[in-house]
């Protein structure tokens, strides 16, 4: 039977007249229905670990907008929590974790095969979604890349320059490499379990890849992504992988060939014309509208959306933002973006 899900067709290399569309953080605080469900859950982590409510918020933007893909509602920091790190969220400050700064901290982490005990509700969310999503909607699972997750585990929070992680990488490379190896192995198991539960695509979010330069980018962004991708493809032939080395700049060039990912997601620091010439030549790209347009809307949103669609029209393209949609976005601007992509 011919594949009917537009996202999967494009990930297989097909060029469509109208690209499939979804948004990073499409289940989020900009939607009133999300805010109501989150209030019902009590807090963010309780929402992540409640399969029925997590499935509900995943479905909300599909009901409202008819996106071509749903992305599992979860968080990249559930993996360190499953490995034994303490995780909590401070109001107005974002995530906080117990820190990894010495060998003794690392030694307290759980083995990789212990993560499923904590993460089993996430897999149940996937199973619910496979039953409830429309037949034309693809389901995307995801995880954070080892480098990005490590930056939070080392600093205990998000940092503007990932300084603590760079300091450990340079000052105690053996410990840092051991942490990256543990996270790489855990990410393989986590994504594999999502696929076994029903995810049809997986995405690896390397939000802080851009702070790695030269050999460090190769060793800690590119190589772990390649290891994860190769392991998943060996276990689950035919499951596409999207890589997102955010703000990689020139590092986007050749990333798909070097890692084996089926699609490279782009942030909006690179222009569509440049990316079409230098990245899309290797296959599918995803992106890359600035999320600020979801706040401001208007003709600028329409014009930029059309420019991106046109720039990537010669090859496989998934329309998306260059970063997650923000809480102050206007839901009507999301509809305007979708209408522009689908109707021209």
From Swiss-Prot:
CDD domains: URO-D
Compartments reported by the entry: Cytoplasm
Entry keyword set: Cytoplasm, Decarboxylase, Lyase, Porphyrin biosynthesis
Biological process annotations from GO: protoporphyrinogen IX biosynthetic process from glutamate
InterPro entries: UROD/MetE-like_sf (IPR038071), Uroporphyrinogen_deCO2ase_HemE (IPR006361), Uroporphyrinogen_deCOase (IPR000257)
Record-annotated disulphide pairs: none
Annotated Gene Ontology cellular component terms: cytosol
Known pathway: Porphyrin-containing compound metabolism; protoporphyrin-IX biosynthesis; coproporphyrinogen-III from 5-aminolevulinate: step 4/4
Pfam families named among the record's database cross-references: URO-D (PF01208)
Site (Transition state stabilizer): 75
EC number: 4.1.1.37
Catalysed reaction equations from the record: uroporphyrinogen III + 4 H(+) = coproporphyrinogen III + 4 CO2
A GO MF term: uroporphyrinogen decarboxylase activity
Positions with a binding annotation for substrate: 25-29, 75, 152, 207, 323
Primary localization class, coarse: cytoplasm
Family assignment from sequence similarity: Belongs to the uroporphyrinogen decarboxylase family.
Role summary: Catalyzes the decarboxylation of four acetate groups of uroporphyrinogen-III to yield coproporphyrinogen-III.
Assembly and binders: Homodimer.
Protein name per Swiss-Prot or TrEMBL: Uroporphyrinogen decarboxylase
Organism (species): Ruegeria pomeroyi (strain ATCC 700808 / DSM 15171 / DSS-3)
């Amino acid at each position: 039977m011919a594949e009917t899900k537009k996202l999967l067709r494009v990930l297989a290399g097909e060029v469509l007249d109208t690209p499939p569309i979804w948004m990073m953080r499409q289940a989020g605080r900009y939607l009133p229905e999300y805010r109501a469900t989150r209030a019902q859950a009590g807090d963010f982590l309780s929402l992540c670990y409640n399969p029925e409510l997590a499935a509900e918020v995943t479905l909300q933007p599909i009901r409202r907008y008819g996106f071509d893909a749903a992305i599992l509602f979860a968080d990249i920091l559930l993996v360190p929590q499953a490995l034994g790190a303490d995780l909590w969220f401070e109001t107005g400050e974002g995530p906080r974790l117990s820190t990894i700064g010495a060998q003794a901290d690392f030694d307290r982490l759980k083995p990789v095969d212990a993560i499923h005990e904590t993460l089993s509700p996430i897999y149940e969310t996937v199973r619910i979604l496979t039953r409830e999503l429309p037949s034309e909607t693809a389901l995307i699972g995801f995880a954070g890349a080892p480098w990005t997750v490590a930056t939070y585990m080392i600093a205990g929070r998000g940092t503007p320059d990932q300084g603590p992680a760079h300091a450990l990488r340079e000052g105690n490379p053996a410990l840092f490499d051991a942490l990256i190896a543990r996270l790489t192995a855990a990410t393989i198991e986590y994504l594999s379990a999502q696929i076994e539960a029903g995810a049809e695509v997986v995405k690896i979010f390397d939000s802080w890849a851009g702070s790695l330069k030269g050999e460090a980018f190769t060793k800690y962004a590119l190589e772990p992504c390649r290891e994860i991708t190769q392991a998943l493809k060996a276990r689950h032939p035919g499951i596409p992988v999207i890589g997102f080395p955010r703000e990689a700049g020139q590092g986007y060039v050749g990333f798909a060939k070097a890692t084996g990912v089926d699609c490279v997601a782009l942030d909006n620091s690179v222009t569509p014309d440049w990316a079409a010439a230098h990245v899309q030549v290797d296959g599918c790209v995803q992106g890359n509208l600035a999320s600020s347009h979801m706040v401001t809307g208007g003709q600028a949103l329409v014009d930029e959306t059309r420019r991106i669609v046109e720039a990537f029209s010669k090859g496989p393209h998934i329309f998306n933002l260059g970063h997650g949609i923000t809480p102050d976005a206007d839901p009507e601007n999301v509809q305007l973006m979708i209408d522009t992509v689908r109707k021209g």
